Amino acid sequence: MAGQPGHMPHGGSSNNLCHTLGPVHPPDPQRHPNTLSFRCSLADFQIEKKIGRGQFSEVYKATCLLDRKTVALKKVQIFEMMDAKARQDCVKEIGLLKQLNHPNIIKYLDSFIEDNELNIVLELADAGDLSQMIKYFKKQKRLIPERTVWKYFVQLCSAVEHMHSRRVMHRDIKPANVFITATGVVKLGDLGLGRFFSSETTAAHSLVGTPYYMSPERIHENGYNFKSDIWSLGCLLYEMAALQSPFYGDKMNLFSLCQKIEQCDYPPLPGEHYSEKLRELVSMCICPDPHQRPDIGYVHQVAKQMHIWMSST
């Protein structure tokens, strides 16, 4: 879900939505062998409008009739796109995501299966996202001030550190998944489920099938790990400064892109506009060897120091 059709912002209040008020529906084990806890049903929501869609999902702005909260309701055709094992893993992952509680993370409020669809109830953030902000500055032919870069990046790091501390990887950090509220609060969305809904959120697609944020270990199919999230954070920090992905190219094919990623071949950030600390952190995160990348604790600490320093100057 990003700030474009098929990827939408989510945000809003998350207090006890449907968790105690919702009707309990007995599961049908034959029809829904991997049913999540039935806390809500579609009858509990008034759908207002569609705000996003993917190949196997649609997202709606909706009102929960039980407490009048405005939410995002994502409907996923789970039985068409997954086998039984993938459904089980997806259900388990959603259970973990519901336990996350952080001011900079889109809250997973509830989930249930109805009419052969997985319905995920999410906090709704109805402002913009980081990709839209980057496009705006690019159109204006202006760089994002470094103070602003750290203001948002430190909040993003706080969100990722919360996830990693609970052994949850994001797997799809990119500007379109970083929502910004009207008051300047970052909300990280599309948590951890990208591999299940692969047709719509596998990687950062600026061109169809072009994964600009894919780490070297993923190119080599060595699996995703916590340091892969760090690579993506480095790419995002670079993009906030340069207004484009470090590995972007106008006429690249997938092979040449993968070569650039493996060799960490990207243009340096302008030293006259951005601090050595920012450029150094980008270099540490966009490192081909995942073992050489810092952990999220270090990245967050640097971001906090720079945010405080920039705010005081």
Curated annotation (Swiss-Prot):
UniProt GO cellular component terms: centriolar satellite; cytoplasm; cytosol; microtubule; nuclear speck; nucleoplasm; nucleus; protein-containing complex
PROSITE patterns named in the record: PROTEIN_KINASE_ATP, PROTEIN_KINASE_DOM, PROTEIN_KINASE_ST
Expressed in which tissues: Ubiquitous, with highest expression in heart and skeletal muscle.
Catalytic residues (positions): 172
GO annotation terms (biological process): apoptotic process; cell division; chromosome segregation; mitotic nuclear membrane disassembly; mitotic spindle organization; peptidyl-serine phosphorylation; positive regulation of canonical NF-kappaB signal transduction; protein autophosphorylation
Pfam families: Pkinase
Activity modulation notes: Binding to NEK9 stimulates its activity by releasing the autoinhibitory function of Tyr-108.
Annotated region (Interaction with APBB1), positions in chain: 267-270
The UniProt record lists the keyword Cell division: yes
Subunit structure: Interacts with STAT3 and RPS6KB1. Interacts with NEK9, predominantly in mitosis. Interacts with KIF11 (via C-terminus). Interacts with APBB1 (via WW domain). Interacts with ANKRA2, ATF4, ARHGAP33, CDC42, CIR1, PRAM1, PTN, PRDX3, PIN1, RAD26L, RBBP6, RPS7 and TRIP4.
Domain writeup: Displays an autoinhibited conformation: Tyr-108 side chain points into the active site, interacts with the activation loop, and blocks the alphaC helix. The autoinhibitory conformation is released upon binding with NEK9.
The name this protein goes by in its record: Serine/threonine-protein kinase Nek6
